[in-house]
From Swiss-Prot:
Cellular localization per UniProt: Cytoplasm
GO cellular component term of the entry, any: cytosolic ribosome
Originating gene: METAP1b
UniProt feature, compositional bias: Low complexity: 79-94
Residues bound to Zn(2+) 3: D342, D353, E483
Binding site for Zn(2+) 4: D353, H419, E452, E483
Cofactor: how bound: Highest activity with zinc and cobalt ions, and low activity with manganese or divalent iron ions. Binds 2 divalent metal cations per subunit. Has a high-affinity and a low affinity metal-binding site. The true nature of the physiological cofactor is under debate. The enzyme is active with zinc, cobalt, manganese or divalent iron ions. Has high activity with zinc; zinc cofactor is transferred into the active site region by the ZNG1 zinc chaperone.
pH effect on activity, per entry: Optimum pH is 7.5.
Name recorded for this polypeptide: Methionine aminopeptidase 1b
Entries under NCBIfam families matching the protein: met_pdase_I
GO terms under biological process: proteolysis
């Protein structure tokens, strides 16, 4: 119960001030009457507290009125417009005085109500307030603890009604929010309701660099219990990777491990080709993710991205200015978009990793520079792969890619690199894609790793979204990416995730005869 200071003196002051105000209004009204043309206006008295029954005052007032009526007749002939303006001003002043008095009376009555005990209805000397009512800004006071306890059953009804009203308001709000956040009604340009969504609330004040916006997410995909899982599937933390990071060596896979990785890569290629067939205007990236997930599960594998450091989906979908790691959501694809789909599969205890960038809809809707960007990215990867062999320094890959891309006036992203893959999703070596990098290591037979250059139309810098995954170009311009998983052999390199004759075309001549001998 909260103690409140004694306000009896304040109430007395309010009463005195109220009486004074009533008398002042009465006097002011008599004075104002002298300036009103009674032939044109009717005076209505709305103030209950003003007394006009005093005969002496009536006679004096009428004498004054008669004098001014004669003056008013003369004034009307000389200047009727000025007199009408004065009358309006006088009436407005009168209304103001009346309203002030009525408001003062209302305040006085409210103060009286606040000084009555909600239990016994006695006048309070000291006020004790119900803590629940006080929290909800409801005026409810009691004499003492005993009165409060004795009135609790009856007083509790106030809380019940209050809770009912709050629940109704909350349900109504949920209905409105659900409607505005539904895929069919969602407006990505209106952030008003984003605060009510666990995913979108992080973006309320975020400054986007391009046109792509986050959309609501669907629920996390379910994985059947019989599917073999990596160590992070439940905890989201890849403990085996953290242990391996303490080492600096590059793992050399044996023949049995290479065979399992090869099978995982074949499944990864089939999955990516299937995802490519789903790309079409109007299709959402969430739908692509859901079908990719079902395809992988159907083949008794686990989608490697799912719950990896809490990544919420089974593949990555990066549209237009999104560099990499875009989270599939309810955003529908549009003709003229470019989309990168990144597939990773955990199968028979090992991972595979690959991605490609596709044109959405009519290729003529894609900007010319966008087409050139995608082609440049693809061939920069393939040219670097051609040079891979035992004895080559990993840092030279970045030199080759950067040289090829620079000739086309594009730039290479520096924030992300290729990596070792196999028993671990990410391991040594680190494979940067830009020149003058400091990567360590020399290629040896049995090394399995990825090369996955991200090429930007504008500046190479990127911005991380508040979801802690999505990376976008800093200038909002387009970005493209391609990735393969590679095996260093005794004689050169094998592309484990290579395209097949059944792979859907990329929309340009990939010159497979040069790269798939």
């Amino acid at each position: 119960m909260a103690n409140i200071d004694d306000i009896e003196k304040q109430i007395e002051n309010i009463k005195i001030n109220s009486d004074d105000n009533k008398n002042n209004v009465s006097k002011n009204k008599n004075i104002l009457l002298n300036g009103v043309n009674l032939k044109d206006h009717e005076i209505k008295d709305n103030v209950k507290s003003v007394d006009y029954n005093n005969n002496n005052n009536e006679n004096d007032t009428m004498n004054e009125i008669n004098k001014h009526v004669k003056n008013d007749e003369y004034c009307n002939k000389e200047n009727s417009n000025n007199n009408n303006n004065n009358n309006n001003n006088n009436n407005n002043n009168l209304d103001t005085q009346i309203n002030e008095t009525l408001n003062l009376n209302e305040k006085f009555e409210k103060k009286n109500e606040e000084n009555l005990c909600s239990g016994c209805k006695k006048v309070l000397i000291k006020k004790l307030s119900c803590p629940i009512c006080l929290k909800n800004k409801i005026f409810s006071y009691f004499c003492n603890q005993e009165c409060f306890k004795g009135s609790w059953k009856e007083h509790q009804k106030i809380h019940e009604n209050m809770n009912k009203e709050n629940n109704e308001k909350e349900d109504h709000l949920k209905t409105i929010v659900k409607k505005h956040l539904s895929p069919e009604n969602f407006d990505p340009t209106n952030r008003k309701y984003w605060v009510y969504d666990d995913h979108l609330k992080n973006f309320v004040n975020f400054k986007f660099t391009g046109d792509v916006r986050p959309w609501p997410l669907s629920k996390i995909n379910h994985v059947p219990s019989h599917i073999e899982r990596p160590d992070y599937a439940i905890s989201s933390i890849p403990e085996s990777e953290l242990i391996y990071k303490r080492k600096s060596d590059i793992y050399v896979n044996n023949e049995e491990e290479i065979q399992r990785i090869r099978e995982a890569c074949i499944l990864g290629r089939k999955t990516l080709d299937y995802a490519h067939t789903l790309v079409s205007p109007g299709v959402t990236t969430d739908e692509i993710d859901r079908k990719v997930h079902e395809f992988i599960i159907k083949n008794n594998a686990y989608p490697s991205t799912l719950n990896y450091y809490k990544f919420p989906k089974s593949c990555c979908t990066s549209v237009n200015e999104i560099v990499c790691h875009g989270i599939p959501d309810y955003r529908p694809l549009k003709s003229g978009d470019i989309i990168n789909i990144d597939i990773s599969v955990f199968y028979k205890g090992v991972h595979s990793d690959l991605n490609e960038t596709y044109f959405v809809g009519d290729i003529n809707d894609v900007p010319k520079e966008g087409k050139e960007l995608v082609e440049t990215c693809y061939f920069s990867l393939m040219e670097a792969i051609k040079k891979c062999k035992p004895g080559m320094f990993y840092k030279n890959i970045g030199t080759l890619i950067d040289a090829y891309v620079s000739k086309k006036n594009f730039s290479v992203v520096r924030s992300y690199s290729g990596h070792g893959v196999g028993k671990l999703f990410h391991s040594n070596p680190t494979v940067p894609h830009f020149k003058k990098n400091k990567a360590v290591g020399i290629m040896k037979p049995g090394h399995v790793f990825t090369i996955e250059p991200m090429i930007n139309q504008g500046h190479y810098s990127d911005v991380l979204w508040p979801d802690q995954w999505t990376s976008a170009t800093s200038d909002g311009k387009l970005s493209a990416q391609f990735e393969h998983t590679l095996l260093i052999t005794n004689n050169g390199v094998e592309i484990l995730t290579k395209r097949t004759q059944d792979s859907p075309p990329l929309g340009f001549d990939t010159k497979d005869e040069l790269y798939y001998n």
